[in-house]
Amino acid sequence: MNVLERLDAAQPWTQEETMLLDSVRQLAAEKIAPRAAHYDKTAEFPWDNVKDINNLGLNAMFIPEAYGGAPLSYACYLACVREISEACASTGIIWATNFHAIKPLMDFGNEEQKQRLLPRMAEGGLAALVITEPTAGSDATGMKTTFTPDGDSIIMNGSKIFISNGDVSDLYIVFGKWSEIAGDKESISAVVLEKGTPGFSITGTEDKMGTRASGTASLAFDQVRIPRANLLCEPGDGLKILLASLNKSRPSVAAHALGIARAAFNDAIAYMNDRRQSGKRLLEFQGLQFNVADLAAELVMVESWLWRVAQLIESNAPNVGIEASILKLKATDLAMRIATDAVQFLGGYGYCKDYRVERLMRDAKITQIWEGTNQIHRQLIGRSFLKKEKR
């Protein structure tokens, strides 16, 4: 048992969680991983992977029992994200995005909203978190989508881009600005939009470098009328909802990245144990041992921090934003480094599509960009040490 396997074995899973993780690993190895190259090539949505995940009831793990769920720990959720992402990064994003979108509804929705909307998610529905716009990426306060109250309804107008699951979802958590509130931050609000609502359209999907089977869509809202009952909290509460949600979704992005990192690391180790040069296996050369040692050490440290942040979130620690940013930053940078090094370790083979490290290198890049670019996370972390000047 190597150090990564010992780290996994040390996690205090319950018997139920252990059984579920075993089932997820089996599904990932036997069905999801063998399909990954096909979906990367065709960029088709992996409906069979989603069906298999739903057959295990995985959506139910982050939904309370009162709404049809079977909740397990946040750490177990992160472990499932990592296992699925190691097999297929696209499928990992699809499933993790469900959590990203459903979590605001669970944390901030009222009882009527939860009773009405969560059971269909527990049964396997798809959801999307809708934030980014052409003029509002890292600075979400620049969004232009508007919510205008009209009696018992809200009229939504605007557009969104780069929305994961945007072309396939049943529910959308949409952020925009309340027309009757001034201020870029103060006006941000959040609503639930259901598939098929008149005036809502999908205007296109992106042809991406990596995670090609995960749909990334552009959305348009033209006089979309939704019930006032679909407003989360009160008008102007959107920024609070958004920031709280990101603190829980960023560790999920880190787990996704660590799945990619694990896949690339394992492929590189297998190749270097098998490939011979000058009468030796590659991993018998000291220089490559040093390379592997550095990657393994960083992987162990980042995964240890993953479980630490999960523990903080499960204990309802009041301030985990910087911890989540550190995790997202280090996990995603490491995924890109390990995937790039794996291509180098495999030489010419690593550059060919017959070996999945080529795909993993492309898949890893998005992890440094979405859920806050790593430049933004560095700014957040650095700024947290800035002391207020005394006046």
Region locations from a protein language model:
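Long, acidic (Asp/Glu-rich), low-complexity accessory segments flanking structured domains
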Residues: 222-241
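Hydrophobic, small-residue-rich alpha-helical packing segments that form membrane-like cores
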Residues: 136-139, 143, 154, 161-163, ...
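Flexible, small-/acidic-enriched active-site or ligand-binding loops
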Residues: 142-144, 196-227
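A short core secondary-structure module
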Residues: 157-202
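Short Gly/Pro-enriched turn/cap motifs at secondary-structure boundaries
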Residues: 135-138, 162-165, 181-182, 208-215
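A short, Trp-centered hydrophobic/proline-enriched beta-strand micro-motif
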Residues: 123-132, 175
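Alpha-helical interface subdomain recognition
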Residues: 1-91, 108-112, 124, 149-154, ...
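Short beta-strand-to-turn element immediately C-terminal to the catalytic PLP-Schiff-base lysine
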Residues: 107-109, 148, 174-177, 192-194, ...
